[in-house]
Each structure stands twice: as C-alpha cells, then as structure tokens.
C-alpha cells in the first residue's frame, strides 16, 4: 500500500470523504488521490517521494510556480511583525493600489479571504445597490459554493454528478436564472421575462469550471449591452482568469468593462485571498460607507497581502504575460497534434495561461451541453496514464489546466512525450 493510500484511509476517519474540497477525492477519475508532501517550481512531490510535472497549480494560484523565492521572501519578512491584526495595514493599501492599476475597471476594491466570499459579497452588493433580487448565471459556470450560486453549478458539483443539490433552499434557487453560456438569445429571454427584477448578471469570461471554454466573439460585449439596457449590474468573475488570461484579466483580453469584478487565486500568491471591486458609486454602497453589510476577521491579512503583492509584482514584469501564453499554446497544440497522430477524437482549447482537454469529435466546445457529451471515461483513462508517467493533470474532465512561468520548454516536451505514449494506449 502506497503512503497516499495509507493517508487517504486515515483521512477518511476524521475528514468527510477524506478531503477538504470534493474534487481532490479523485471521484471524477477514480483511484486514490495523490497526497502532496512538497512542491517546487513546476513540480509537486507526493508522500511516497514521486515527482510530477504539475498542471493544477493549486487550482490556479501558482502562476509563478510553487515556492517562488519572491513570495517566500515576502512572507518570511512579514511573519515576524505578526500574523493577523484585525485592523488596517499599509500592505492592504499597496496591494489595492496595484490591483486598481492592473485592472482599470476596478476603482475601489475590498479584500476578502476566498473567491467564494468575493462572489457572494458582489452578489449581495448588486442586490442592495439595485433593490432587486434575481440574478443571472450560466449553466456550467461556477462562482463558489454560496447558496444563490449553487444552481446548476459546474466544477466539483459536476464532478460529483450533482449540477444542483440538497442544502440549497428553493427560495434561494428561485431567484437564480440560469442561461446557456455563449448564447445571447437565452439571456435576452431572461431579461425580457423579468425586465425590472434582475439585480445582476455574473459570468466566467472564460468558463474554467466546465473545463476551458472561451466566449464567442460577441458574447461578453453582448452581455454588457443587455445589462446596460435593463439596469443590471454586470459582474465578471475573474477568480480564475484574473491576471492569468492577461495581466488585466479576461476583461482586458476581450476588451469589455464590467461594473464589478471578483478576484481570487493569483491575487493571493498561494495564500487565501479574494477580492471584489468595481465602480466607485457601487462599491461605496458597501459598509462602512453604505448600507450593504460585508465583513471578515481575516480580510486583508498582512501575510496574505505580502504574498499577493509579491506575486503580482513578479508577474507584472515585462515578457511574463507573453511567455505564459506561448507556453500554454505549445502544450495545448502539442496535445492536439499527438491525439491526431493516434486517431483519438480530441480537441484542446486555451486562452492565456489556462487550457482544456476534451475527448470529442467536435472541433470546438462552446457550452455545458457540449461538454457533457464529451468522453469523460476516456479522459479518466488518459489522466491515469499521464499520472503514472509523472504528469499531474486536473483530476476531473470538467476542470481547466494551468500553466506556470516555472514550466520550462523541457517540462513541456516531457509532458508531450508522456502524452504520446498515453494517446497510443487509448
């Protein structure tokens, strides 16, 4: 029995399902989850000492690679001053200034401790600001596990085969309208049906929780126009895409300006940080300047602020954005070429530093229903064939993969060499 198997058996006695987030349990791909002991650069090492080239990157935050010296140094310098104060610090101002510089649509920003907290707070703010209750989200998109948003959600909910599940009151769900991603007509219909009741529309600009699905050319700008027409707050959820699709986020990449933006993952550099921000007139509607309440004991935590500031400062250096995108392109197109070589129905999609692998005859995947028609069983087999060769992909056919600046050309070629063997066995 491997050390990971021993640890998983032990974990299940004290932790529900043996994990602290469902996708980690490998329910989507089968087998025993890999327990990680340490990580460095593009590599993770499991409890048995086996190394893997990592394309999960803690589900996105590790854009510089694991254990980056700039982040570690910043954290070690901050720790001796105290771990948490529950009071304002200069570091939270500095990080906020950098965020507003990198993402111009954000005029004011509030720090929180997770992406879920960011989206939950943004939804509450939009409802308070507009005086309306209903929200629009998209089938297959995931915005965290708050009640209002766990309605036909993607991510772990899909991995478990529960697009919506128990524990979410019907009274919450009735206010959430679910439209089809990349289909403006479905959004128009929702607005026409409830023209004066919709507080906001929230969207993943690149849907990364039903794998990796970019928006069609007119989709995001069409959403912006509909929100303007009906007086709804337009929220772009950049928890995953922020600073990864482009330094200014997917909104910069696709040239669209939201009213509110939610952030997470990269903004913390590996520490638990989320944020939401946007137009001053909306953000000032939140406490203490406005009536909408939001608070957090660990919001703006000084250690997390130090890590986030170091991460964004390093990522902002010239050439990094382009390098990340180029490496991702090489990997994704390499996967596709190898699948074609072995006559495996397959397509790869990518934007900036994120990518998706689909086992399908379709040349392009554009929405949730098309994702559900892909061959998840074949992905599961591919996942394990890659894992055996020391390549760690997302353990779910519904999750995007992530490139980091630590991945070298040699790492990518080693990954593709492993993929060549894996595709040959499918």
From Swiss-Prot:
GO terms for molecular function: glutamate-1-semialdehyde 2,1-aminomutase activity; pyridoxal phosphate binding; transaminase activity. InterPro entries: 4pyrrol_synth_GluAld_NH2Trfase (IPR004639), Aminotrans_3 (IPR005814), Aminotrans_3_PPA_site (IPR049704), PyrdxlP-dep_Trfase (IPR015424), PyrdxlP-dep_Trfase_major (IPR015421), PyrdxlP-dep_Trfase_small (IPR015422). Pathway: Porphyrin-containing compound metabolism; protoporphyrin-IX biosynthesis; 5-aminolevulinate from L-glutamyl-tRNA(Glu): step 2/2. Its EC number is 5.4.3.8. Its main location: cytoplasm. Keywords: Cytoplasm, Isomerase, Porphyrin biosynthesis, Pyridoxal phosphate. SUPFAM superfamilies: PLP-dependent transferases. It catalyses: (S)-4-amino-5-oxopentanoate = 5-aminolevulinate. Gene3D superfamilies: Aspartate Aminotransferase, domain 1 (3.90.1150.10), Type I PLP-dependent aspartate aminotransferase-like (Major domain) (3.40.640.10). Its cofactor is pyridoxal 5'-phosphate. The modification N6-(pyridoxal phosphate)lysine is found at residue 265. One of its GO terms (cellular component) is cytoplasm. It is found in: Cytoplasm. One of its GO terms (biological process) is protoporphyrinogen IX biosynthetic process. It holds the Pfam family Aminotran_3. Homodimer. Belongs to the class-III pyridoxal-phosphate-dependent aminotransferase family. HemL subfamily. HAMAP family: HemL_aminotrans_3. This is Glutamate-1-semialdehyde 2,1-aminomutase. It comes from Actinobacillus pleuropneumoniae serotype 3 (strain JL03).
